[in-house]
Amino acid sequence: MLAVSLLDSIGDALHPARSAKDRRFVAIKVNRIYVDVGGGSEHTAIVAGAYVAGQPTWRRFGVAWRDVLRDAGARVFHATDFFQCRGEFAHITLNSPEHLELAKRFVGVARRHTAAGFAFGLHQRAYDELIAPELARVGTSHAHVTIEGYAILTCLMLGAQFGLPRDSGRTAAVILEDGPGMGATIELLNHIKALGEEWTTPYLSFTTMAKSQYPLQSADLLAYEGWKKITDVFEGAGRDTRKSLTALIEKLTVNVSYAGEDELTRFKPYLRRFLRNHPDYEKRPQM
């Protein structure tokens, strides 16, 4: 599937997914994949997280997720707020039995009512130093490759490999959380698709929606959990894997991968060679 790709062999898997082509959702031909990003400019890692499922599954997800939100006394799930008991969750005591039970329920809904999940993280400093200069000319006249955009592209490539295998005939509409830079990311995705990268084949469309969409909140949960673990790996803290992430990745169709300094150093010569051989990826001057 990666015969010609800007993203080939970029990272290593913390938890590799088993291909989902034989799973129960094989009969669902048109899916939706929801994508969110965790981490910011002040953090070690940037992580994109995504879940994919068919519309009937997402409808069941919405009912179950809404019930947990109602019991939590909140309207919208933001993982950072929930796990730190602030914002809409400020009335909950951190690590109280109520808090732990709600965490278990949110994770349970994400596990039961999705088909596959993907998270991909990048080491921010290493990306800025090693990869960003190589990608400076890639994109369109209005869209360049940000670290968030590159994490999203790689996350979607994993989704195509493991959740939407080419021989399955399944397709998906991609929904990103609305926010700064997402319009440019969508333009970049359309640009990559127009260039014919095979992993983009199952993706029918790219759009944004507000965080009020429940499936985007599940993507936020996976991005946050991936960000916590991948940051720990990058910083060498050696902490045990969080129970919430352990529960999420017990599902065999969840993939968590990353590219730190070592992985990006190995990837840089491939990327440089690829761009030299494929000048059509470069921005065209405005007329």
Question: Language model features by range: what are they?
Answer:
Residues 1-287:
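Phosphate-ester processing/binding pockets and catalytic centers
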